[in-house]
Amino acid sequence: MDGENHSVVSEFLFLGLTHSWEIQLLLLVFSSVLYVASITGNIFIVFSVTTDPHLHSPMYFLLASLSFIDLGACSVTSPKMIYDLFRKRKVISFGGCIAQIFFIHVIGGVEMVLLIAMAFDRYVALCKPLHYLTIMSPRMCLSFLAVAWTLGVSHSLFQLAFLVNLAFCGPNVLDSFYCDLPRLLRLACTDTYRLQFMVTVNSGFICVGTFFILLISYVFILFTVWKHSSGGSSKALSTLSAHSTVVLLFFGPPMFVYTRPHPNSQMDKFLAIFDAVLTPFLNPVVYTFRNKEMKAAIKRVCKQLVIYKKIS
């Protein structure tokens, strides 16, 4: 009976995205450009917020935390996907597969809490401006960050707990380009229908629940601003619209996946590419182009880098 707790499958084989050479080439260029842009954009945001005194505020602290998470989000699956595009045998070790699942759920959990924290930050800024710095103190910001990481890691460990007593002794082919927990459960030697249902409900409930919390909070904020509208609110509303855009980009793909009655493998792959490559790229774009202070800070950072290169 001891063998039931040990996997005899040492690696998993990915079917990948497509067998078309032309589409693979397009995906290689598309994914590589967006990956480099995502890394560069998010590093610029983290560096700008860290070094520029003009951005030392709660809102930008949370934004830098989100960009740090996005650095991980675009690095968990994208590099291997790009590396495997033209490989005939796309494999990942059992440990590598578990690591992918762990980090995917950690990053997803942390990002959800950070988006809630950013919504709360905008609520305080717009509805209680006189108490903003008192409520959104450094201690409060660090508490948000600690809660985000605690819940993210806890959620991921809870998801992985489903795999503890499962044996993988036969098929090892995943119709994907990364390790997805529901697909991995289907490869187990035992009946995992209930486990698949629990995993889907757990992730779907958290995703949909968080989305509606954010939706209600943004509607409440907009209603409050509309009641006390003034010219000084335009800047805050612009920031709020940027937050709303990021929320839609983040929750759109997973909500579509978890709420559909009939999953579609090709559609899931497309949404996974969107989630893994495009969303981390669009986040810094949305926040940068819609925020004058952030654009000014990035320009100052670029000037400093140019001066540093000239000196060196």
UniProtKB/Swiss-Prot annotation:
GO molecular function terms noted in the UniProt entry: G protein-coupled receptor activity; olfactory receptor activity
One Pfam family hit: 7tm_4
Matching InterPro entries: GPCR_Rhodpsn, GPCR_Rhodpsn_7TM, Olfact_rcpt, Olfactory_Receptors
Domain of life: Eukaryota
PROSITE patterns linked to this entry: G_PROTEIN_RECEP_F1_1 (PS00237), G_PROTEIN_RECEP_F1_2 (PS50262)
Parts of the chain on the Cytoplasmic side: 50-57, 121-139, 220-235, 290-312
Ranges per topology, Extracellular: 1-25, 80-100, 159-195, 259-269
Protein location: Cell membrane
Keywords: Cell membrane, Disulfide bond, G-protein coupled receptor, Glycoprotein, Membrane, Olfaction, Receptor, Sensory transduction, Transducer, Transmembrane, Transmembrane helix
Topological type in the membrane: Multi-pass membrane protein
Cysteine-cysteine disulfides: 97-189
Gene Ontology annotations for the cellular component aspect, listed alphabetically: plasma membrane
Recorded family membership: Belongs to the G-protein coupled receptor 1 family.
Name of the protein in its database record: Olfactory receptor 4F21
